[in-house]
Protein backbone atom coordinates (compact mmCIF):
# COMPACT_ATOMS: atom_id res chain seq x y z
CA UNK A 1 0.00 0.00 0.00
CA UNK A 2 1.16 3.53 -0.75
CA UNK A 3 -0.45 6.82 0.27
CA UNK A 4 0.70 10.28 -0.75
CA UNK A 5 1.95 12.92 1.65
CA UNK A 6 -0.41 15.91 2.08
CA UNK A 7 2.43 18.35 1.38
CA UNK A 8 3.17 16.56 -1.90
CA UNK A 9 -0.41 17.01 -3.01
CA UNK A 10 -0.29 20.66 -1.94
CA UNK A 11 2.77 21.08 -4.11
CA UNK A 12 1.16 19.27 -7.04
CA UNK A 13 -1.84 21.60 -6.94
CA UNK A 14 0.44 24.64 -6.71
CA UNK A 15 2.32 23.37 -9.77
CA UNK A 16 -0.89 22.87 -11.75
CA UNK A 17 -2.25 26.29 -10.84
CA UNK A 18 0.96 28.15 -11.68
CA UNK A 19 2.43 26.14 -14.56
CA UNK A 20 -0.56 24.23 -15.91
CA UNK A 21 -1.00 20.54 -16.57
CA UNK A 22 0.54 20.81 -20.05
CA UNK A 23 2.90 23.24 -21.76
CA UNK A 24 0.32 23.93 -24.49
CA UNK A 25 -3.29 24.13 -23.34
CA UNK A 26 -4.98 26.52 -20.88
CA UNK A 27 -5.35 25.30 -17.32
CA UNK A 28 -8.72 23.48 -17.08
CA UNK A 29 -11.34 25.20 -14.94
CA UNK A 30 -11.60 22.07 -12.78
CA UNK A 31 -8.43 23.06 -10.95
CA UNK A 32 -10.16 26.18 -9.63
CA UNK A 33 -13.00 24.02 -8.36
CA UNK A 34 -10.51 21.64 -6.74
CA UNK A 35 -8.67 24.52 -5.10
CA UNK A 36 -11.94 25.94 -3.78
CA UNK A 37 -12.66 22.66 -1.97
CA UNK A 38 -9.05 21.60 -1.51
CA UNK A 39 -9.20 20.50 2.13
CA UNK A 40 -11.86 17.94 1.32
CA UNK A 41 -10.30 16.83 -1.97
CA UNK A 42 -6.88 16.42 -0.37
CA UNK A 43 -8.37 14.42 2.50
CA UNK A 44 -9.89 12.06 -0.06
CA UNK A 45 -6.62 11.73 -1.99
CA UNK A 46 -4.39 11.03 1.03
CA UNK A 47 -6.63 8.12 1.96
CA UNK A 48 -6.18 6.38 -1.39
CA UNK A 49 -3.82 3.51 -2.06
CA UNK A 50 -2.31 5.01 -5.20
CA UNK A 51 -0.86 1.66 -6.29
CA UNK A 52 -4.46 0.72 -7.12
CA UNK A 53 -5.52 4.17 -8.36
CA UNK A 54 -8.17 3.91 -11.07
CA UNK A 55 -7.44 6.38 -13.86
CA UNK A 56 -10.06 8.44 -15.64
CA UNK A 57 -10.37 9.19 -19.37
CA UNK A 58 -7.77 11.59 -20.75
CA UNK A 59 -7.49 13.74 -23.87
CA UNK A 60 -4.96 13.21 -26.65
CA UNK A 61 -4.92 16.25 -28.92
CA UNK A 62 -2.79 17.44 -31.83
CA UNK A 63 -0.69 20.55 -31.31
CA UNK A 64 1.36 22.38 -33.99
CA UNK A 65 5.11 21.77 -33.87
CA UNK A 66 7.46 23.87 -35.98
CA UNK A 67 6.11 25.10 -39.32
CA UNK A 68 4.50 22.01 -40.79
CA UNK A 69 4.64 19.41 -38.02
CA UNK A 70 2.35 18.30 -35.25
CA UNK A 71 2.70 16.41 -32.01
CA UNK A 72 0.19 14.70 -29.77
CA UNK A 73 -0.28 16.32 -26.35
CA UNK A 74 -1.80 14.36 -23.48
CA UNK A 75 -4.09 16.19 -21.06
CA UNK A 76 -4.80 14.02 -18.05
CA UNK A 77 -7.86 14.11 -15.83
CA UNK A 78 -7.11 16.69 -13.09
CA UNK A 79 -7.16 14.19 -10.22
CA UNK A 80 -4.98 11.79 -12.20
CA UNK A 81 -2.56 14.63 -12.89
CA UNK A 82 -2.34 15.58 -9.22
CA UNK A 83 -1.65 11.98 -8.18
CA UNK A 84 0.91 11.51 -10.98
CA UNK A 85 2.66 14.79 -10.19
CA UNK A 86 2.78 14.12 -6.44
CA UNK A 87 4.21 10.64 -7.03
CA UNK A 88 7.00 11.91 -9.26
CA UNK A 89 7.64 14.85 -6.91
CA UNK A 90 8.29 12.44 -4.04
CA UNK A 91 11.11 10.69 -5.95
CA UNK A 92 12.35 13.62 -8.08
CA UNK A 93 15.34 14.35 -5.82
CA UNK A 94 16.48 10.72 -6.11
CA UNK A 95 16.19 10.89 -9.89
CA UNK A 96 18.16 14.13 -10.13
CA UNK A 97 21.04 12.67 -8.11
CA UNK A 98 21.26 9.76 -10.54
CA UNK A 99 21.70 12.00 -13.59
CA UNK A 100 24.87 13.57 -14.99
CA UNK A 101 25.57 16.46 -12.57
CA UNK A 102 23.99 19.74 -13.62
CA UNK A 103 27.22 21.62 -12.88
CA UNK A 104 28.95 19.83 -15.77
CA UNK A 105 26.58 21.52 -18.23
CA UNK A 106 26.40 18.41 -20.37
CA UNK A 107 22.71 17.70 -19.86
CA UNK A 108 20.82 20.98 -19.92
CA UNK A 109 17.21 19.82 -19.87
CA UNK A 110 14.78 19.78 -16.98
CA UNK A 111 17.13 19.90 -14.01
CA UNK A 112 15.03 19.34 -10.91
CA UNK A 113 14.93 22.24 -8.47
CA UNK A 114 11.59 22.27 -6.74
CA UNK A 115 10.23 25.29 -4.91
CA UNK A 116 7.11 25.68 -2.72
CA UNK A 117 5.55 27.77 -5.50
CA UNK A 118 5.16 24.62 -7.62
CA UNK A 119 8.35 25.13 -9.61
CA UNK A 120 9.75 21.80 -10.81
CA UNK A 121 12.86 22.79 -12.77
CA UNK A 122 15.76 25.22 -12.51
CA UNK A 123 14.69 28.19 -14.66
CA UNK A 124 18.32 29.13 -15.38
CA UNK A 125 18.96 25.86 -17.20
CA UNK A 126 17.09 25.35 -20.44
CA UNK A 127 17.16 25.48 -24.22
CA UNK A 128 18.72 28.94 -24.39
CA UNK A 129 21.58 27.87 -22.15
CA UNK A 130 21.92 24.73 -24.26
CA UNK A 131 22.50 26.79 -27.41
CA UNK A 132 24.89 29.11 -25.58
CA UNK A 133 26.91 26.19 -24.25
CA UNK A 134 27.21 24.67 -27.72
CA UNK A 135 28.78 27.90 -28.95
CA UNK A 136 31.08 28.05 -25.91
CA UNK A 137 32.37 24.54 -26.56
CA UNK A 138 33.25 25.41 -30.16
CA UNK A 139 34.92 28.66 -29.11
CA UNK A 140 36.81 27.40 -26.07
CA UNK A 141 37.63 23.72 -26.62
CA UNK A 142 40.34 23.24 -29.22
CA UNK A 143 40.16 20.73 -32.02
CA UNK A 144 36.44 20.49 -32.67
CA UNK A 145 35.66 21.27 -36.29
CA UNK A 146 32.39 19.40 -36.75
CA UNK A 147 29.10 19.10 -34.87
CA UNK A 148 26.83 16.11 -35.39
CA UNK A 149 23.17 16.91 -34.69
CA UNK A 150 20.70 14.20 -33.75
CA UNK A 151 17.33 13.88 -32.11
CA UNK A 152 15.26 10.90 -31.03
CA UNK A 153 12.14 10.51 -33.13
CA UNK A 154 8.92 10.16 -31.11
CA UNK A 155 10.90 10.07 -27.87
CA UNK A 156 8.13 10.20 -25.26
CA UNK A 157 5.58 8.05 -27.15
CA UNK A 158 8.25 5.35 -27.68
CA UNK A 159 9.71 5.05 -24.19
CA UNK A 160 9.47 1.38 -23.25
CA UNK A 161 7.92 0.82 -19.85
CA UNK A 162 10.35 -1.97 -19.00
CA UNK A 163 13.29 0.36 -19.61
CA UNK A 164 11.69 3.11 -17.53
CA UNK A 165 10.88 0.68 -14.73
CA UNK A 166 14.50 -0.47 -14.56
CA UNK A 167 15.79 3.11 -14.61
CA UNK A 168 13.48 4.18 -11.78
CA UNK A 169 14.37 1.17 -9.64
CA UNK A 170 18.06 1.96 -10.08
CA UNK A 171 17.49 5.60 -9.10
CA UNK A 172 15.33 5.27 -5.98
CA UNK A 173 14.69 2.85 -3.15
CA UNK A 174 11.02 3.86 -3.09
CA UNK A 175 9.84 0.73 -4.87
CA UNK A 176 6.18 1.38 -4.11
CA UNK A 177 6.39 4.74 -5.88
CA UNK A 178 7.86 3.04 -8.93
CA UNK A 179 5.10 0.43 -8.88
CA UNK A 180 2.43 3.13 -8.60
CA UNK A 181 3.89 5.19 -11.46
CA UNK A 182 4.21 2.17 -13.74
CA UNK A 183 0.65 1.19 -12.85
CA UNK A 184 -0.63 4.61 -13.94
CA UNK A 185 1.24 4.40 -17.23
CA UNK A 186 -0.06 0.90 -17.88
CA UNK A 187 -3.67 1.94 -17.27
CA UNK A 188 -3.38 5.01 -19.48
CA UNK A 189 -1.80 3.01 -22.30
CA UNK A 190 -4.00 -0.06 -22.22
CA UNK A 191 -2.33 -2.94 -24.06
CA UNK A 192 0.67 -0.90 -25.23
CA UNK A 193 3.87 -1.31 -23.20
CA UNK A 194 5.47 1.93 -24.29
CA UNK A 195 4.79 5.65 -24.16
CA UNK A 196 4.38 8.25 -21.44
CA UNK A 197 2.06 11.30 -21.41
CA UNK A 198 3.45 14.08 -23.60
CA UNK A 199 3.54 17.71 -22.54
CA UNK A 200 3.72 17.74 -18.74
CA UNK A 201 6.47 18.20 -16.18
CA UNK A 202 6.38 14.84 -14.36
CA UNK A 203 6.73 13.03 -17.68
CA UNK A 204 9.84 15.08 -18.40
CA UNK A 205 11.42 13.84 -15.18
CA UNK A 206 10.65 10.25 -16.18
CA UNK A 207 12.04 10.77 -19.68
CA UNK A 208 15.28 12.18 -18.30
CA UNK A 209 15.98 9.18 -16.08
CA UNK A 210 15.16 6.85 -18.97
CA UNK A 211 17.85 8.38 -21.15
CA UNK A 212 20.39 8.98 -18.38
CA UNK A 213 22.19 5.70 -19.07
CA UNK A 214 22.76 6.85 -22.66
CA UNK A 215 24.46 9.98 -21.32
CA UNK A 216 26.71 7.88 -19.09
CA UNK A 217 27.57 5.49 -21.91
CA UNK A 218 28.58 8.33 -24.25
CA UNK A 219 30.76 9.85 -21.54
CA UNK A 220 32.39 6.47 -20.83
CA UNK A 221 33.35 6.27 -24.51
CA UNK A 222 34.96 9.71 -24.41
CA UNK A 223 32.38 11.34 -26.68
CA UNK A 224 31.98 15.09 -26.14
CA UNK A 225 28.35 16.04 -26.36
CA UNK A 226 25.64 18.27 -24.94
CA UNK A 227 22.02 17.24 -24.70
CA UNK A 228 18.68 18.99 -24.27
CA UNK A 229 15.81 16.54 -23.93
CA UNK A 230 15.97 14.40 -27.10
CA UNK A 231 18.34 16.76 -28.96
CA UNK A 232 22.04 15.85 -29.04
CA UNK A 233 24.98 17.95 -30.23
CA UNK A 234 28.09 15.80 -30.62
CA UNK A 235 31.42 17.56 -31.11
CA UNK A 236 34.07 15.95 -33.29
CA UNK A 237 37.46 16.63 -34.84
CA UNK A 238 36.44 15.40 -38.30
CA UNK A 239 33.47 14.33 -40.38
CA UNK A 240 34.33 10.66 -39.94
CA UNK A 241 34.74 11.02 -36.16
CA UNK A 242 31.35 12.70 -35.93
CA UNK A 243 29.77 9.92 -37.97
CA UNK A 244 31.33 7.27 -35.74
CA UNK A 245 29.94 9.00 -32.66
CA UNK A 246 26.48 9.12 -34.26
CA UNK A 247 26.75 5.40 -34.93
CA UNK A 248 27.61 4.80 -31.27
CA UNK A 249 24.57 6.84 -30.19
CA UNK A 250 22.30 4.95 -32.59
CA UNK A 251 23.58 1.61 -31.32
CA UNK A 252 23.07 2.60 -27.68
CA UNK A 253 19.51 3.73 -28.39
CA UNK A 254 18.76 0.57 -30.35
CA UNK A 255 19.83 -1.60 -27.43
Question: Can you annotate each of these PLM segments?
Answer:
Residues 49, 57-61, 70-76, 131-140, ...:
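Catalytic micro-motifs at enzyme active sites that drive phosphoryl/nucleotidyl and oxygen chemistry
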Residues 84, 88-147:
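Active-site-proximal segment of RNA-dependent polymerases
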Residues 90, 94, 171, 252:
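Phosphate/oxyanion-binding loops and surfaces in catalytic or ligand/nucleic-acid-binding neighborhoods
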Residues 54-59, 98-100, 176-180:
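Short, flexible active-site-proximal loops enriched in glycine and acidic residues
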Residues 23-27, 56-85, 102-122, 187-208:
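Short, conserved non-catalytic motifs in the polymerase core
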Residues 121-229, 233-251:
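Conserved polymerase palm-domain catalytic core
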Residues 1-64:
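Non-catalytic, polymerase-adjacent accessory regions of viral genome-replication enzymes
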Amino acid sequence: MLTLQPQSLDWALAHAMRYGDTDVFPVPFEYDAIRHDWDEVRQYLVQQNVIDWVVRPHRALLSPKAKYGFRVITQLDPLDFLVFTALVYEIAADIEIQRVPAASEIVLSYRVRTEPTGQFFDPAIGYRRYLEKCREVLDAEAGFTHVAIADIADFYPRIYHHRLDNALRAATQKASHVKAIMGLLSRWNGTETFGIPVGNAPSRVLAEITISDIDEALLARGIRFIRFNDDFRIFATSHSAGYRSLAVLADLLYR
